[in-house]
Each structure stands twice: as structure tokens, then as C-alpha cells.
Amino acid sequence: MPIAASLRVLLLNGPNLSLLGRREVDVYGTVTLADIERTLQLDAQDLDVELSCLQSNHEGVLIDAIHDAFGRCDGLVINPGGLTHTSVALRDAIAGVGLPTVEVHMSNVYRRESFRHHSFIAPVAVGQISGFGADSYRLGLRAIALFLRRRAEQDEGPCR
């Protein structure tokens, strides 16, 4: 059986990421979230992925989006921002819907302050990409698309 080509992926960005390009440019550079989303939409076309994007400074909005993604999306790419290190609720939402998730960070969180070294999201994600600037997002999108397609190939094996 042929594998459905088009994947549906939700990109979530947490608190303060709307300030990319203006905030801590020595850490994050001058690229804006709008720039990142434009690039990802082009990448998504090449990957045959339907990409939806949402940024919120509010934990509950992100949790609602994760809940709403259940049954509508195949996977998630998330940069939880500061919620990475604090939000059990965000972690539980991801675990609860069971959607494959890739966690991304522009900076290498393990080369920064020690409080950034712990992620509540990583244990429920299929992978984590950090330290490649805006390319962390591009790598994250490619990673989730590859993961989902490989999983679909296994599910659609020759005798199924």
C-alpha cells in the first residue's frame, strides 16, 4: 500500500520567541520568528509537509494547541522557550496526546546556565536538536518528517 505523502506537522513556539531578532542577539542572532516560519514553509513544501505555526507567551494556549493537534496532526516540533525547564503541564500534554515530538532550541542549552540543562520535554520527545541557530528548526522539521515517514513505512510493511 502506498504511504500517504503529505504529513501534518504543528510548530509551536513558547514564551518570548516572538522577540527573536531583537532579544539577546548575541545568543539568538537577528533572525526573526517570521523569518524562521517563512523558511520552514518552503522546507515543508519540499518535504511534502503541511506546516501550521503557533507562538504564544501563555502556557495554556500551547497546551490547548497540543490537545487540538490530536487526530489532526501527525507530529510536533516545539521550542518551548523557558517552559522547557519548568513546565510539567506542557510535558504532560505532549505525553497525553502521544504525538511524536521533536524539541528544538536555537542555542546549545547545555553550554548555557545550569538551570537550562534540564528539559521536562526531552523525555517525551523522539529527539532534541539544539545549538544550530535558526537551522535547529530546519533540522527539527526534517527530523520529524523522516521519523514519521519511516514509522509509516514500518506500519505499511509488505504483509500488512
Curated annotation (Swiss-Prot):
Catalytic activity: 3-dehydroquinate = 3-dehydroshikimate + H2O
Annotated keywords: Amino-acid biosynthesis, Aromatic amino acid biosynthesis, Lyase
Lyase among keywords: yes
Pfam families: DHquinase_II
Active site: 28, 105
Annotated substrate binding sites: 79, 85, 92, 106-107, 116
GO BP term, pick one: quinate catabolic process
GO molecular function: 3-dehydroquinate dehydratase activity
InterPro entries: DHquinase_II (IPR001874), DHquinase_II_CS (IPR018509), DHquinase_II_sf (IPR036441)
First-tier enzyme category under EC: lyase
Record pathway: Metabolic intermediate biosynthesis; chorismate biosynthesis; chorismate from D-erythrose 4-phosphate and phosphoenolpyruvate: step 3/7
EC annotation from Swiss-Prot or TrEMBL: 4.2.1.10
Record site feature (Transition state stabilizer), residues: 23
Function: Catalyzes a trans-dehydration via an enolate intermediate.
Family to which this protein belongs: Belongs to the type-II 3-dehydroquinase family.
Family annotation (PANTHER family): CATABOLIC 3-DEHYDROQUINASE
Complex and partners: Homododecamer.
Protein's name in the database: 3-dehydroquinate dehydratase
Native organism: Gloeobacter violaceus (strain ATCC 29082 / PCC 7421)
Annotated gene: aroQ
